[in-house]
C-alpha cells in the first residue's frame, strides 16, 4: 500500500500536479502566486514551498504583506524565497480527512481536527481530535483514482493539500471525541504519561527530522479516548 508521498509520486505520474501546491491553489481559485510575482491586496498570507513531499509543514509560515510596502521587494525575491509561493491565509480549523472511493465518489470516513501551539509555528500541533468533516470536494477531485485512499487537508473548510494516500490510518480505530496529544522532543508530558502511547509510524527518529530542516521533532502520541 502507498504510505508516503514520494511513493505516490512514482505510482501516479498522471496526478503529479497534485503535489504542486501552487497549481492546486490556482485550481481552487485562491489568491496566490509564485515567488517574484507581487501580491495585489494587503493581508495575511501563507508562504511555503511549492513542493514538499516530506510533509510536516516544512518552511511554511504566516506573513502579513502589503503591496504598497512589499510589492517591489517581492519582485526581487524578498519575502518569498525561490521555490516558494504565496497564498491567501485561511482562518479556522485545520482538518485532515481520509476518504475512500464509493461508486466513483470520494467519501470521508475519518477526520482529525488539529490545534497549533501558536499561529507562528505551523509544524507543531498540540492536539488532534477525532471529529466530523467540514469539507465538500470539488467535482474534479472525484476524477482522481488511487490504490484505495485519498487524504485531504483543509483550513476553515478550504482545501490546502491533497495526498494520494491515507493520512490518519494509525488512529482509524478511535471514535469521535478521542483526543490525541503529539509528543515533541524536549517537552515534558508528565501529565499525560498515564495515557496509552502510540509510536510514530516509523520507529527511527531521524525520519522525522528532515535532515535538520525541522526543529520540532515528533516522537509519537498520547491517546485520550472518549
Where are these regions (language model features)?
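ATP-dependent carboxylate activation and anion-phosphoryl transfer catalytic cores
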Residues: 55-56, 104-107, 115-121, 126-226
